[in-house]
Structure formats: C-alpha cells, structure tokens
Amino acid sequence: MYSQHGAPMAPPQKPETFMLSNEAQQSLPHDAQVALQQVDNLKYFLLSAPVDWQPDQLIRRFLLPTGDYISCVLWSNLFHISGTDIVRCLAFRFQAFGRPVKNSKKFEEGIFSDLRNLKAGTDATLEEPKSPFLDFLYKNNCIRTQKKQKVFYWYSVPHDRLFLDALERDLKREKMGQEATTVAVSEPALSFEFDSSQSLYEQLTKAQQANSSSFAAHASTTYGQSASPVVRTVDAMPPPQMAPQMAPPSIPLLTDESANSQMYTSIPMPNPIPQNLIKREADYGAIQYDRNGMPIARIHQRHSSMPTFVEYSPAPSFVSSQYEDYSNRGLSFEPVTPPQHSSHIGPEPAYIANEDTGLYTAIPEMSTGSGFNPMMHLPPSNLASAHFPTPARTFHSNVYSVLEGSPTYKQRRRRSSIPPGAANPVTTGTHSPAPALSYAAHKPSDLRRSVSSSVAPGDTDDSRHESLHRSVNSTYTATLPQKNLMHEMSRNGTPLSSVGEHREQSSIPLTQAEDLPALPANGTVESGAPNGVGHKSDRYATGPVRRARSATMMELGPYPQKSHSCPIPSCGRLFKRLEHLKRHVRTHTQERPYPCPYCNKAFSRSDNLAQHRRIHEAQQDGQPLVHEDDLENDDNESVSHDEDESPSESVHPAVPGVHGMTSMPSSVALQSTMGSMMGSHMIAPQLLQQQI
C-alpha cells in the first residue's frame, strides 16, 4: 500500500512475528496480514495520540476492530491511559496474533500484575475512589469501576513488553499442561515456536540485533534522496489524518498512496499561491539528519532493544503540527521531539518534555518568548521554501521508545551508566540556583506530580541538593549504621543526580524527617533548601521526582553496554563488570567459597555470608530470626540486582572510612524498607566485614 524506495530491506522484527522466518512472514494468510496491519494502526495511535489537541479537548479515542475504544485522556496537563484500556489493547493484539482470549478474568489478572511494576508517582497517578478524574474516565467508558486505582502516564506503558510477558505466561502454562488464558487458533500463533531457555523479550532483542545488520545495509538506498515527491514511510506506518485547519487552505488533502503518486505533478494551483509552497524534498541538502542531529545513515546503529517499528518513535512530548508539518521530513509520519525551549505560540497549545520527569505538558504563554524559543519568529515549517529554509533543529536526546514504555519496568534497581565526564545538554550550572530559576520560567508548577507515600522524594534542583550535601556530611556517618539510607532510598525513590554530573556531586537523597533522626527538622537542612525540606508536604511540592534514568543519555534502549559474556554456551549472559561475571559463573558451578565460621554453611557470595552471620548475631542478642529461605534464594539468584551498582555508584563520597560498599541483596532490601522490622544492628554487609 505504501511505496518503498530503493532495495528491499529485511522485514521489521515485531513481537507478533519475530520468531518466524522472512519467508514465513511473507507467506502468512491474507487475514493474518490484515490483522497485523490493524495492530500497526493501533501502534500508530499509541505513538501519536497526544498530537494536535484543541485547547478544550480532554479525550481522544481509537476504535478497535473488536468494537472497544482506546482513550487518550488529558488531565492535569498530562496524558493518561487506564489499565482497562491497556487490557483492551492487549486482548485485541492477542486476537490479531491468532490467540484469542478465552479466560478473560485470569488474563486481566496477569496484565494488572505486570502493571504493578509501573509505580505511582513515577509512571502513574494513584487516584482516590470516585475522584473527579475517575468520574470522568468512568463516564467515558475508560474504566469499569471508580475504586482506588492507578491511571498510567501515556508513554510509561511498555505495550510490547506487556504483550510478550502475557504470551510467555500462556506458553509456559501450555508447556506444563496447565490451562492457558488464550488459545492458538490461527496464524501466526500456530507457527510460533517457544524457546523456554530465555524470555521472549530477550529473544526479541536478539532478533532485532540480528536484523539490524541487514536493516543498516539498505540505509543508503531505502532512505536516500528520491526524485519522487511522494512522502516515504517507515515499516508501513499509516499516515496521519491531518486536521483540515492545519493544511494550507488552497491545497487539497492527499493520502500517501502509491496510486496517487501522479497527482502531485498535476494538481491545479491558484495563481496567488507561489509554486514553492508545494516543494517538498527540494529543501533538503545532500545529507539528512535524524531527531538527534545525527546523519541519517548512522541512525540505524540503534540499540538492539529498540523495536524496528518505533525506530523513529517520539519522545514523550510534541509540538503541534501547525509548526511541525509531518510531510516535510521525508522519513516517517511519527511526531518527534521539539527543541528544548519550545513554548506556547498562538492559540494552540504546544507540548514539551520535562527532562526531569520524562512527561510532557502544555507550555504557558511567555511574554519574553524570543529569549527562550529560538524558533518562535520563524515561519511554520509547512510554509518552508527557498525563501524560508527549514531551520536546523536540536533535540533533547534523553528519550525512550513509546512502545517499550518506562525504562524502569521490571528494572527498578538499574542505575544510570553515563560516565562522569559525559556532556550534559540539559542541566548546567550545578553550583548555582540558576537551573531552578530556569525551571520556574518555563515549567509550570502544576506539572509537578503528587508523590505517593510509598515513593520517597528524589533530589530536586541542584542548589538544594548541594546544600543538603554539605549539611549532612557531619551527621551521615552517625546515622548510617542505624539505617542504610543509601540502600533504602535506592529501592524506594531511586534518587539520581542529573546526567553528566560528577560523582562527587551525586546525591544524598532528600529523605523523610524520620530517616534522619540526627538532623534538626528545621535547622541546617532547611536553611540550605529555602523551600523547606523539613516538612513532608513542602518537600513533596517543591519539585518533581526524577525518573529513574536507566535509559541513559547516549543509549536509546534501557540496557547499558555489557562486555563480559558467560562462558557457558547455553547461557551466554552479558555483564558490565568482570566480578559480576565471576559471581554469576558460581551459579553454574555451585561453588561456595564463603563458609560461615559459626555453622560452616557455605555461600557463593560474600554479602550472603554477611547477612547469614547477622542471623547468628541476632540470635545471640535475642532478636527475632530472619527466615533462612531468603538467603537460599539470594544464594542462587542472578546478579542482575547489583550488576549495575558499582561501589563508586552506591557509596556517598562524603562518608569517611567507608569504601567499596555495595548495595545489599534483595532479601535485605525488604527489611531495610520496613523500619519496624529492622534493628539498629542491621547495617550494610560490607561495613560489617570491615568492622570484623
């Protein structure tokens, strides 16, 4: 349906068909191909729903072939999707895949269980029963009940990952002879072969990596210059429905179909309109650039975890197409990230990313817009011509794929892997309060998300962070043995410093008053933070909680680079550090080089031994015992929980005498977050070893 220029390239690797060979994908029945095309249409809606909203518009719907509607809801300047609509999306995708749902209740339970990984305050908003928001969703058939529930931020939902996780659950049930929630009745589900040695998401990642070489091989031909003015598409993405008021008034709206290719040269144009208004590709130079300012030939060196379908996927913010015409890019119809300082122009709202929260919002009108927005006085891009060349655009590169959703999904413990010297295109002036002033100038306070009680506030602006850093230095050592604050905050709030900051400027997170008993509630900390971190409500309102940036500034996928591979052929797992690889190999060899001096029980990890020794010490002190099963589980679990937490990342540099401290294993993480269950003797295992 959509023309492809240049040499044919390998078909995109999609979750529904990545296990099939190229020949099998091409030979799918017509009904299956139509169903998969309908899935692509749904994906396009998930990509572009927040674009071109009217000032008074609150909801936008997409009609599924099943008769259900998927709704994108604008509420409090943020776009949302309900859990019920997420289930509807997945049920339709399973039906198009050839595995219709037969046990709806159990199917929904599995989806909502996965959605628990999207935390309130970070990837969702937690609504109280019968709140105005829930009432609006209920009246528009977005939810079935107005009970207390989470409503998810539009671009935090990992739609492809949810599909693969649900499919993997059913395939495992079938393999074990249990009843599955879906049943395979048609292609491509009947031809789908399941390899239980690794997750479907990992298999999709490897399939994309294998496909990227052939994808890049055709880059120079598929995306090269063409003499045809027909706008090209990527991966059969459907063209957007341009609003009539967005198009020049005298130019008829055209669809991007190959059958209409001859119409571009024969459209009668009125005399008052110059011919250069319809010039499309003549405005491009010999080299095209992607949204990150890279030459287009290099865009295919993407991270392997990024699906081909959303290679040009948007960041979670857009500028209205009144100023950003789709058809003037010659790549695909997806929205792209606006310049960092874009602001409100004219009567239609413009949307911009909040680099701290990963969300997007409507920008208020500013009288000094020319100082913030270098493109404000330029003509709209749909009028670009030889007289008004399309301006070069710079884009914020800290983005993640919309269909992959939040990078923190099932990766709550990952840390940023940006080197200390990496350039920071967003945050500057770490030693002055200038960033806070700049934030207030073009980021309205209503953006700031309410934080649930289970999520501790992260570091806000750099001036407050640095003043807290200085004031806590004298007391942090005294409070560390009572409660492992760094570990607790990394599990609850995932506080992260701004990308590009030096290790010495990394965070002591803003903790709750009860977590810092040695600090005065309104003393030195409050003096360093004028907005008042001594009061919980004030702290929650003074700034947004930073998103856990497991997707780093230089990487498009959520996984950091790893260079050490497991030597076991059937495993081949990759690790960032050699010590993590050695620790992982012990899970294969069952080597346990750390015996307990009390009972001679051996462990494969030193931190598990340290935790085990605390059981003996607690028994001697008359404290309640920690369940031994937790140690057994930790002894055999993978090192994914701490493979990205090196000593330099986990320990605060201002703590004297504590070096090389890593985070505690997951069984201690549960105890560290429950103050009532943790005594003053529960300290970090590495610190315990140093004391011994």
UniProtKB/Swiss-Prot annotation:
General function of this protein: Transcription factor involved in sexual reproduction. Required for cleistothecial development and ascosporogenesis. Not required for asexual reproduction (conidiation). May act to repress medA expression.
Taxonomic superkingdom: Eukaryota
UniProt GO molecular function: DNA-binding transcription factor activity; sequence-specific DNA binding; zinc ion binding
Family according to the record: Belongs to the STE12 transcription factor family.
Protein's recorded name: Transcription factor steA
Localization annotation: Nucleus
DNA-binding region: 56-165
PANTHER family membership: PROTEIN STE12
ZnF bounds (C2H2-type): 564-588, 594-616
A biological-process GO annotation: regulation of secondary metabolite biosynthetic process
Signal sequence segment: none
Compositional bias per record (Polar residues), positions renumbered to this chain: 470-482
Biased amino acid composition, Acidic residues: 629-647
Gene3D superfamilies to which the protein is assigned, alphabetical: Classic Zinc Finger
Gene for this chain: steA
SMART domains to which the protein is assigned, alphabetical: STE, ZnF_C2H2
Residue ranges, annotated region (Disordered): 406-507, 519-540, 618-665
Main subcellular location: nucleus
Gene Ontology CC: one annotated term: Tec1p-Ste12p-Dig1p complex
Species this protein is from: Emericella nidulans (strain FGSC A4 / ATCC 38163 / CBS 112.46 / NRRL 194 / M139) (Aspergillus nidulans)
Keywords: DNA-binding, Metal-binding, Nucleus, Repeat, Repressor, Transcription, Transcription regulation, Zinc, Zinc-finger
InterPro entries tied to this protein: Ste12 (IPR003120), STE12_transcription_factor (IPR052127), Znf_C2H2_sf (IPR036236), Znf_C2H2_type (IPR013087)
Record-linked SUPFAM superfamilies: beta-beta-alpha zinc fingers
A Pfam family this chain is assigned to: STE
